[in-house]
Amino acid sequence: MTDIVIKQKDNLHIRVECDDGIAYELSQHFTFDVPGAKYTPQYKARKWDGKIRLFSVSSKTIYVGLKNDVIDFAKKEGYSWECEVEPIDCNLSKQQFTEFTQSLNFHSKNKKIDLRDYQIDSAYDSIKNNRSLILSPTSSGKSAIIASIIRWHTSQDRKCLIIVPTVSLVSQMYSDFADYFSESDWKVNENCYKITSGAPKNNTYPVTISTWQSVYELGAEFFDVFDCVIVDECHLAKAKSITGIMEKVRNAPFRVGCTGTLDGTLTHELVLRGLFGSVYKAVTIKELMDNKQIAGLKVNCLILQYSDNEKQHVKKLDYQQEIDFLVSHQQRNNFIKNLALSRKSNTLVLFNLVERHGKPLYELINSSADDGRKVFLVHGGVDADEREQIRFITETERDAIIIASYGVFSTGVSIRNLHNVIFASPSKSRVRNLQSIGRGLRNSDNKEHCNLYDISDDLSWKSKKNFTLEHAVERIKIYASEGFTYKMIKVNVTNGK
């Protein structure tokens, strides 16, 4: 008798037929601690142990995407196994799909473009295997990959749901599709519907684009019409919201997740692989740079130096108090102002706190800018259509400054004509930093490389390092691991008088 038999339960789950002893082993194998769980009310009230269990002992089910992990478990533990789960045969060869993408007549900025090999390969893998977790870095053209996927499925009379993390990205995805197919009979306004705040929840178009916040609380009947679901920037989703939506899209055998990185994800990699399938590594940032498909990057780590009195003051502060000290430091803000104004070409200044840092920086920079130089402030409170308009304006400007919140501009927002990026606020998140860097890596006709100015603050006193300096060390480790060229420059904060 076979120890483990894997069968299809539905489009989201497989059933593992095995005895109870093996079921408990599988449960342990697919259990992990949730980062930060100990800070949640449920954990503190002892109503939850802070773990996620992906294998259900009672129903003996687990996500379809972890099928290969179950097989690996069986092999490792010496159990005999059978798998009766097979993807839907799309009867599509790689050559046929390549020819199909060529027939779509992709354009960008009114110029005909050909999809790169890794874009075609990524899209084809998701169709052939019915599901895929596409790992493709910022500036690699994920929207073109998604466009080719939805064009194939809609050509087969399948409806597609695209889920993105922000309202800005709903507008941008829609605009990208309009750009790609501007010379095609396939018109975006006839085939795609945007769900934004206050808009009717329409699912009658071939393609629906929405944030997960806009559809999370809708009933399963809204999702029943979709055959394919694609989640962009899926690393940003919290486990509860993303699994809730994916469980409602019960009639969709085709499931695709796109992400630029799996390091430090809010949703554990096992959950993402379970929901979307095996990881498909499309390309690396280094490969894109080596092939001149994205701009080069020069990282300047600017380490601000402070007086002994300030260092002794900060050593007594907790993390939040240190942040408060930095964002209200007039000389530091003046330094950021002078740096932004002295840069040539378009510059993006990224901050964390809107009221206490973003708005003061905007007022400081805008009041000192030369007449005619455009300075924009972008944050979550700015209307999505206005943000999209600012993005388009910047594409045609040569010397604009965008002061933007990390939350809005660190993810997905595409500006080709961007030459300088300034990190005005500290962060150690690998995901956020790489996504933010990506804002400046897109190629344009007048750019060979992007300059990143990473501002950090050395407020260490004797052997005690301040919190944000430790974050800076983590960012430098990221630059080294990605193979970026960087240099470290000490600057006296009084230079920002």
Descriptions of predicted regions:
Residues 314-352, 356-367:
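Conserved interdomain hinge at the start of the Helicase C-terminal
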Residues 224-227, 404, 413-426, 435, ...:
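A short beta-strand element within the Helicase C-terminal
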Residues 171, 191-202, 359-360, 373-410:
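Conserved helicase ATPase core of P-loop NTP-dependent helicases/translocases
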Residues 87-135:
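Conserved pre-motif I regulatory segment
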Residues 235-300, 479:
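Post-DEXD/H (motif II) to motif III coupling segment of the RecA-like Helicase ATP-binding lobe
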Residues 439-473:
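Conserved segment of the helicase C-terminal RecA-like domain
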Residues 128-152:
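Walker A/P-loop
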Residues 168-194, 368-372:
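Conserved helix-turn-beta segment of the N-terminal RecA-like "Helicase ATP-binding" lobe
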